[in-house]
UniProtKB/Swiss-Prot annotation:
GO terms for molecular function: electron transfer activity; heme binding; iron ion binding. It is found in: Cellular thylakoid membrane. One of the extrinsic, lumenal subunits of photosystem II (PSII). PSII is a light-driven water plastoquinone oxidoreductase, using light energy to abstract electrons from H(2)O, generating a proton gradient subsequently used for ATP formation. The extrinsic proteins stabilize the structure of photosystem II oxygen-evolving complex (OEC), the ion environment of oxygen evolution and protect the OEC against heat-induced inactivation. Low-potential cytochrome c that plays a role in the OEC of PSII. Belongs to the cytochrome c family. PsbV subfamily. Keywords: Electron transport, Heme, Iron, Membrane, Metal-binding, Photosynthesis, Photosystem II, Signal, Thylakoid, Transport. The keyword Chaperone does not apply. It comes from Cyanothece sp. (strain PCC 7425 / ATCC 29141). This is Photosystem II extrinsic protein V.
Length: 162
């Protein structure tokens, strides 16, 4: 009898987590969803839908190389706020990340790397980028900027966290 009760409790808890776990995680408050829009100090509060779309699009187009905010091809350049802020031009805003996704440059901003990094400019080489609209790029950028607030130092922290 005790064994049946334990199995029932485990099943109920598992079912509750499956059906409610993602809904709870998706409820980000406005402060968490507020990120830098540009370098001039303007902010934008993303809708929950934008963050959800950003996550989906990031997973489809970016996560194969940037899962967890890392960069598989260059582990010293992650998607953490500090790394994005030190890039030239700065990439720690929605506008900066959208600009990068359109035409990526080296970390110092000197050279275009569109031929070796997926972008709108190189959509003929990277089909995952072909159908991304300006709104999609904004959602992806917003998702990238929200993640450090949600995951903390795990975002961009590397394999020690995964």
């Amino acid at each position: 009898m005790l064994k049946r009760c334990l199995w029932l409790v485990v099943t109920v808890l598992f079912a509750w987590q499956v059906f409610n776990g993602t809904a709870i995680a998706a409820q980000l408050d406005a402060t968490t969803r507020t990120v830098a829009l540009n370098d001039q100090g303007k902010n934008i509060t993303l809708s929950r839908r934008q963050v959800e779309d950003g996550q989906r699009l990031f997973n489809e187009a970016c996560a194969s190389c940037h899962a967890g905010g890392i960069t598989k091809t260059n582990p010293s350049l992650d998607l953490s706020p500090e790394t994005l802020a030190l890039a030239t031009p700065r990439r720690d805003s929605v506008a900066g990340l959208v600009d990068y996704m359109k035409d990526p440059t080296t970390y110092d901003g000197e050279d275009s790397i569109a031929e070796i990094h997926p972008s709108i400019k190189s959509a003929d080489i990277y089909p995952k980028m072909r159908n991304l609209s300006e709104q999609d790029l904004t959602a992806i950028a917003g998702y990238i900027l929200v993640q450090p607030k949600v995951q903390g130092e795990k975002w961009g922290g590397g394999k020690i966290y995964f």
